[in-house]
């Protein structure tokens, strides 16, 4: 009986970790209502871009594992497809991953992406947003998204992202949040 209790306890802990663990154990992702941590990283044009550069706009800050991989390419294509709708809603798309500026530039050129991709090669910003994952001893940005309002506050967080429908989810949330703000 004691063995069964131990097994059940271990399975419970593993199950909870699987549901809530995400990409890292720190649990320090900015919460809804919190100020989004500011940062500066180089873009695919090898120019510094800071979060505060977009003050006054809605920001879709999305972290993704790797340029040129299937899920990341689908997610980027969908954000690009919907970019005009985001722009009509005073929103910008900003992608972050651990690849360097050259990789991002090649990815943007090959895939026809016109929004900013930022190089977080030291994983500092990914860590600030609790969006680092490790796979085979390599570190990547986890697939997380933060919707930040024009005042720099986090309004929505996605820690479970399905790349094929994600842009549509973000657009719907942005529309709902803007509607709620307008009615206040």
Each model region followed by its residue ranges:
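A short beta-strand-turn-helix
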Residues: 30, 39-58
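Short active-site neighborhood of thiol/selenol oxidoreductases, capturing the structured segment around
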Residues: 52-73
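N-proximal helix/coil linker or "cap" segments that precede and/or mark the start of modular domains
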Residues: 4-6, 10-38, 182-184
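Short loop/turn microsegments at loop-to-beta-strand junctions
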Residues: 36-37, 58, 142-144
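Thiol-/selenol-based redox modules, centered on thioredoxin-like
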Residues: 140-184
């Amino acid at each position: 009986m004691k063995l069964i209790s131990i097994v059940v306890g271990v399975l419970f802990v593993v199950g909870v970790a699987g549901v809530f663990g995400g990409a890292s154990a720190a649990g320090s992702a900015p919460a809804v209502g919190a100020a989004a941590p500011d940062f500066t990283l180089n873009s695919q044009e090898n120019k510094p871009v800071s979060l505060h550069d977009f003050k006054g706009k809605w920001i879709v800050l999305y972290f993704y594992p790797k340029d040129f991989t299937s899920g990341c390419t689908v997610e980027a294509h969908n954000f690009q497809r919907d970019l005009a709708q985001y722009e009509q809603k005073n929103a910008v798309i900003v992608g972050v991953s651990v690849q360097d500026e050259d990789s991002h530039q090649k990815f943007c050129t090959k895939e026809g992406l016109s929004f900013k991709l930022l190089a977080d090669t030291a994983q500092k910003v990914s860590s600030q947003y609790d969006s680092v994952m490790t796979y085979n001893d390599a570190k990547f940005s986890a697939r997380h998204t933060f919707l930040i309002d024009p005042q720099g506050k986090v309004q929505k967080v996605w820690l479970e992202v399905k790349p094929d429908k994600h842009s549509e989810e973000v657009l719907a949330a942005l529309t709902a949040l803007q509607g709620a703000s307008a009615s206040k």
